[in-house]
Structures are given as structure tokens and as C-alpha cells.
């Protein structure tokens, strides 16, 4: 409330509800702190230095952590929104990567599409984590992934990442001297070029022609790469070579490998999910690990929000 000294008019305004003390940090300070530590992956000590050197404002690591906790709590409604957004999407990308929490092996799980990103940390890589996320058990769309078998229990259809196939085929060619793998790599890249030129999807005639060539390469590959080949001088049953494992997988999941040429929304790769989790690897290179599961959950929720906000701008 303020009274004008000249005319005597009294002006009143609503007191900010977030202000509860005589002196406290404003939202701009909190937002900047959270963005630097969680968005830009800057360690707490360096965030302290930034505020001290640039703003002449002392912030302790404990205060920075409290700001992150507050951001986590305020984003609880967003957490439900992103899960609903993921469930509505006809296509989602999934991936997971190792995470060090308190010196123990854990996992960061990612589910994302062109609009929404959801990260979640868990000690389990498989079903326990998927169940706790409360998304995939109810999902009915297409899942794009890197052939992690647990995902095959969810979604209605699947699409496999051909970037991974290309790398595996190159290994077969270079290390196992397989010719079929060279031909398969060339075919997959050729199909991808054709899909791009066609605007995202091939007609049924072209699909059929490519499927025949795909099957022929695999059939010839079986002669070149037999099951459990005998190794001279070695007794007992020999392990099946990696090249044959790959061949069998490409045959068994042909529909999922080639789905990108049949469904326009399905991409050639799972690169979207891989890009999403890349910053987690950067965080661990900078900071080493997460001290607690709570810290990992804060990181995941804030990163989910930042990634989603950038996509819907």
C-alpha cells in the first residue's frame, strides 16, 4: 500500500504469495540455479562459483539442491501429463542406458516421441522398471527400440533400429569376412533412400520386391554362415557365431526390421531415443555419478520437462 504525497491517492496491490520472509531468493534465482545444474549439467560447486563471481550472491550446494527438490515437486503434475502424452502417441521410441547411483549399477529409461520425453531411473533394466513407470503396460501403439527383448511384451507393433543393424553388419563383414552382411547393409541403405524419395512409405509392389531381395540375401547367408561350425582341434559343441545370431534375428524379425518402408511414421533408426539419453552420459562424465536415487529422480523429471519444452516451442 502506498499513498501519494501530492494528491493523497492510495494504491494497493496483491502481495506475492510466494514471498513468506523478509529476505529470500526469488524465482528467477531458483530457475537459473536449476537450469544450470540440471539443464546445463554444471556441478554444484561451479554453480556456486557462478553466482558468487557473476552476481555477488552466495549460494551453497545445499541451497541449490533444495531448489532442485522444489522444481521436482512443482513438476509432479507435468509428470502425469507427459505419461498421458506418451500413451496417446501412435509411435514411441524407447531406450535405456547404465546409470551409477551411489556407486551401484542402475538404469535410466527413456520413452519419447516428437512431442514428449519421459526419463525414469531404476535399479532394474527390465520389467520391474517398466511396471513402475506405469506407461508401457497400457500402451497400444508402435514401439521403436534396439531389440531389447523385454519391450516385446508391450505395444501392438514393433520397429527395430537399423543404425544398430548397420553397425552389426559392418562388424560381420570386417571381422567375420561375411559377404551376405555386406549385401544386406547395402540393401537396407537402398531401401531407406527409396523411402525418403517416396515421401515416407513405399507402395506394395516395391515392398514386395525388396522383401524378396531381403529373403534371398538371408537364404544365401545361411550357406555362407552355417550353424555351430566345427573348429579344427576343438572338442564339443561350438558356440554359434555372432554373424549367424544376427542373420537369424534379421530373419525372425523381418517385419520389424522393414516396418519403416511400410508405415510412414516409423523412422529408419531409433536415433531420437539415443539422442535423448546422450546427455545422461555427458552428466556422468562430468559429475561421475548420482549420490542418491532421489537425486537421479530429480534429474530425470527436470530433464524430461526441459526436453519436452524444447520440442513443443
Residue ranges and their predicted role:
Residues 1-312:
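Catalytic center-proximal scaffold of phosphoryl-transfer enzymes
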Amino acid at each position: 500500500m502506498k499513498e501519494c504525497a501530492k494528491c493523497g491517492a492510495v494504491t494497493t496491490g496483491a502481495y506475492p504469495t510466494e514471498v513468506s520472509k523478509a529476505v529470500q531468493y526469488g524465482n528467477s534465482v531458483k530457475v537459473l540455479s536449476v537450469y544450470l545444474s540440471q539443464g546445463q549439467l554444471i556441478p554444484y560447486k561451479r554453480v556456486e562459483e557462478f553466482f558468487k563471481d557473476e552476481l555477488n550472491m552466495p549460494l551453497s550446494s545445499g541451497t541449490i539442491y533444495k531448489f532442485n527438490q522444489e522444481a521436482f515437486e512443482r513438476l509432479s503434475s507435468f509428470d502425469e501429463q507427459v505419461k498421458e502424452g506418451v500413451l496417446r502417441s501412435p509411435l514411441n521410441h524407447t531406450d535405456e542406458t547404465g546409470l551409477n547411483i551411489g556407486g551401484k549399477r542402475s538404469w535410466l529409461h527413456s520413452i519419447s516421441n516428437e512431442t514428449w520425453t519421459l526419463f525414469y531411473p531404476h535399479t532394474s533394466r527390465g520389467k520391474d522398471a517398466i511396471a513402475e513407470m506405469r506407461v508401457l503396460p497400457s500402451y497400444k501403439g508402435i514401439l521403436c527400440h534396439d531389440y531389447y527383448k523385454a519391450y516385446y511384451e508391450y505395444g501392438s507393433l514393433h520397429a527395430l533400429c537399423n543404425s544398430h543393424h548397420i553397425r552389426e553388419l559392418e562388424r560381420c563383414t570386417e571381422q567375420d569376412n561375411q559377404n551376405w552382411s555386406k549385401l544386406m547393409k547395402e540393401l537396407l541403405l537402398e531401401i531407406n533412400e527409396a523411402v525418403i524419395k517416396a515421401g515416407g512409405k513405399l507402395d506394395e509392389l516395391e515392398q514386395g520386391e525388396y522383401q524378396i531381395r531381403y529373403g534371398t540375401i538371408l537364404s544365401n547367408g545361411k550357406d555362407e554362415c552355417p550353424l555351430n561350425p566345427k573348429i579344427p582341434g576343438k572338442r564339443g559343441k561350438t558356440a554359434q557365431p555372432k554373424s549367424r545370431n544376427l542373420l537369424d534375428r534379421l530373419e525372425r524379425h523381418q517385419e520389424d526390421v522393414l516396418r519403416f518402408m511400410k508405415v510412414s511414421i516409423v523412422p529408419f533408426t531409433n536415433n531420437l531415443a539415443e539422442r535423448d539419453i546422450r546427455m545422461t552420459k555427458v552428466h556422468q562424465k562430468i559429475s561421475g555419478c548420482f549420490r542418491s536415487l532421489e537425486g537421479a529422480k530429480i534429474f530425470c523429471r527436470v530433464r524430461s520437462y526441459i526436453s519436452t519444452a524444447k520440442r513443443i516451442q
